[in-house]
Regions:
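Glycine-rich oxoanion-binding loops at beta->alpha junctions
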Residues: 1-12
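Mixed-charge interfacial surface used for oligomerization/domain docking
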Residues: 18-19, 27-47, 53-227
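Glycine-rich phosphate-binding loop signature in dinucleotide/nucleotide-binding domains
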Residues: 11-19
Length: 227
């Protein structure tokens, strides 16, 4: 991993003056800390962003970084702007099976067995560094409702933007695209003012939660002001 990253940085720096590197949240992976340590050998030419994002919210950070660069911001300024907005995002994930959380050591075998017996559909949350438990649903339908209601609450209370005009809304899923498309219709009905971007969950997340997962995510929009 280390060699791959630095080789790519070296390649990019042959034709570019600076790099903005955005790894996944430091609370979920050691790759962020590793990248930061590696960047110390590049005399400020590589700016590693630790803005606690992952999956579709990290994708939005990459788009934001590109737009900020086109607006005239340098790498250090982009890093600062993205990190200033590190807590202005939310992710809610419904897990369809507990087996992968058990295999990853995130829940005990006993808890997994009990949850499977009760047919629980946990809803997990990321608001910052960690992946945390948010709610337990008995059905997929209930889990969907919990996630939509939680996102509505975030729009209104966390971001003070009930109509969603200043918020990027995203969705993600593992394996079952048909179920994801059906859920997307429900989410779109709940948030008619938002354009929804949907992508598969990254492999680094999928391996911990397994197939059949559904997620809603959002991040507050960043203004791009020319110098």
């Amino acid at each position: 991993m280390v060699g791959d990253v630095t080789d790519k940085w070296d390649e990019f720096l042959k034709e570019n003056d600076e790099i903005v590197y955005i790894p996944m949240s430091s609370g979920l992976s050691s790759s962020c800390e590793t990248a930061y340590m590696l960047s110390q050998d590049y005399d400020g030419k590589v700016q590693v962003v630790n803005n606690q994002r992952i999956s579709v919210t990290m994708r939005q950070s990459v788009i934001d970084a590109k737009n900020l660069a086109e607006a005239g911001k340098n790498a250090a300024e982009i890093k600062q702007i993205l990190e200033d907005a590190k807590f202005e995002s939310s992710i809610y994930i419904m897990v369809d099976t507990l087996n992968y959380l058990k295999k990853g050591g995130r829940i005990t075998p006993a808890a997994a067995a009990l949850g499977t017996l009760l047919k629980l559909k946990p809803v997990l949350q990321i608001q910052g560094e960690k992946l945390d438990a948010f709610a337990k649903a008995r059905t997929v339908k209930q889990a969907k409702s919990i996630m939509i209601d939680a996102m509505k609450s975030d729009f209104e209370k966390r971001f003070n933007n009930p109509d969603g005009s200043q918020i990027n809304l995203e969705m993600a899923y593992t394996h079952d695209i048909a179920a994801a498309e059906a859920f997307k219709e429900e989410v779109q009905a709940a948030f008619p003012n938002n354009e929804i971007v949907m992508n598969p969950l990254s492999l680094s997340v999928s391996c911990h939660i397994g197939p059949g997962a559904l997620a809603i995510a959002c991040s507050k929009k960043i203004e791009y002001c020319n110098k």
